[in-house]
Amino acid sequence: PPFRGENMKEQLQLKNHLKEVRTEANLSQAQLAEMVGVSRNTISSIETGQFNPTAKLALILCIALDKKFEELFYF
């Protein structure tokens, strides 16, 4: 079965293309952070997979970078 126990949490880890998209847009972590109202450290943590953004922050990032959710995030 695809999702069982502890494996489910691991398999549902949200991954992202945030760093690639941000650099394509010629934005620093600090610039993007200011645009979306979070700290630079939060952007860094999202990019490295240490932190999963809330649904609201994920949507704000998509709007700020003019990308669809599936262009920025994946499982």
Identify what each model region corresponds to:
Residues V38-F51:
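Recognition helix of helix-turn-helix/homeodomain-like DNA-binding domains
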Residues N16, R40, A55-L59:
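Short alpha-helical elements of helix-turn-helix
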Residues N16-M35, I60:
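Short basic helix-loop element that most often maps to the first helix and adjoining turn
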Residues K56-E71:
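DNA major-groove recognition helix of helix-turn-helix/homeodomain DNA-binding modules
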